Amino acid sequence: MEFCSWLKVRSKGGDTVLFHTFSNQEERRNYGGSAFIEIQFCKLPAKTKRKDLAKKINFWQNDSLYIDDVETFFHEYSHIFNCGMYSNLESGVVDLYGVNYYAPNFIDPIIQRLKEEKTAEYEIVIEWLDKAKRYNGFYILGI
């Protein structure tokens, strides 16, 4: 059985694996359990009230990106994902231990910043964000 579907790119002087995908829950559990940040499509309707966006999340989706290197992710991406809405409806830098929602209108500006700054494995994030345009934005779900 293949252990995990890896997304690999050469980044900042070496092979790194910052982002992971899993084809099922068993794969994820075998790899590392639940100690991941999850970047997940928001599949709720566009008319969902803002206060309800954080209440109806289904964690551990197979089309999500998973991050186990929290420190590197924060260092590389916190200044880019600095416009998310927390579950208390406040906004700010990505909360690594909470729910962060990014509305669809934030996707293109985030992609533009990624192209300019070329953060670690930014190509993977851009490809995933292009798919997020089909949905009602996305979440970054902390550990």
Which stretches of residues belong to each language-model region?
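Acidic (Asp/Glu-rich) sequence patches and key acidic residues
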Residues: M1-E127, K131-Y135, Y139, I143
